[in-house]
Amino acid sequence: MICPKCTSLSIVKEGTRKRKTGRIQEYSCNSCHKWFVVPVEKEVKGERESIFLEDIEPGDILEYKTDKVFRLYCATDVHHGANEHHYDKFNEFIDEVDSDPNARWILNGDNIELIPPNYKISQRGQSMEPDEQHISFIKRIEHIADKLLFIRGGNHDMIRSVNILGFDVSKVMADILRVPYYRMPGYTRIKVGDVTWYFVSGHGKSGGKNGDLELDKMAAVYSDGDVFFLGHNHQLYAKPLDSLRVLGDKEGVRRRWYIRGGSFLEYADYARYSFFPMVRTGWATIEFAKDKIRAWTN
């Protein structure tokens, strides 16, 4: 096996991902530290492998499998193209993902600002046109797209583009970057060796001050979750929730996590006008191991 990035022969076979179209094998390169994937069973449509062209529909479960500890870097509410987008902070995120050999990451909606013409709010809130936002953002992240687990749309990108044009800009981004696309909230099954964890994620809808209330609703619907992750309200925190369960003839502690993923948007004019609370920019990182899950904010 030769690395397609740098042609090195120093390749390590990593975990696999299960898809509806088959299974893909992941590899990492010891020379350039990049990752690439090879379909275990190739199915070709035209000139592209169908394995990358996948929507995770409501009710479907995406699976990621690995034999070692890995860290999931969660980017939500990036708002690339907004006047107040925090370029330095998101560049820091990109560098972290790029330098971590055990990294995977997600895009969880509101990835670009996307204020279309004649929309209910002024286009003055963005620093470039929507098409330029889409193109420049893809160029900005494409060198770490090999570590991207999935993309989800939010109210800024997916909902606006679908309602106005019947065109899902987030789905197109996922197709270009060849990663699965979540249109709705849902489970991701994560297998670390013989241990299975369930990561529940969605963009979010509520702007309420208490971010736990929406996470409570999510946990009630997705009751098998171990980690519950939402964006949208730009709050940034990760906190454990412990409960008691039955382990044989004794009680044991089950730990789950509530996470609001923050944003990469500084104090915008609309927030200032409405006296929204000021929150720091940043992201959440989740580490999945065989024995436990850890989570923290950056």
Report each predicted region and the residues it spans.
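Beta-strand-turn-beta hairpins that frame and shape the catalytic cleft
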Residues: 62-73, 187-199, 253-256
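Core catalytic region of metal-dependent phosphoesterases/phosphodiesterases
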Residues: 55, 59-61, 66-71, 75, ...
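Short metal-coordination and nucleic-acid-contact micro-motifs, chiefly zinc-binding Cys/His arrays
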Residues: 1-2, 23-25, 224
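Short recognition patches in nucleic-acid-associated and regulatory proteins
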Residues: 5-22
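Short Cys/His-rich local motifs and their 1-3 flanking residues in nucleic-acid-associated proteins
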Residues: 5-9, 31-35, 233-235
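Short, non-ligating residues that shape and space the ligands of small metal-coordination modules
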Residues: 12-14, 35-39
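Conserved beta-sheet core of the metallophosphoesterase superfamily
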Residues: 198, 205-296
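Cysteine-rich micro-motifs
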Residues: 21-35
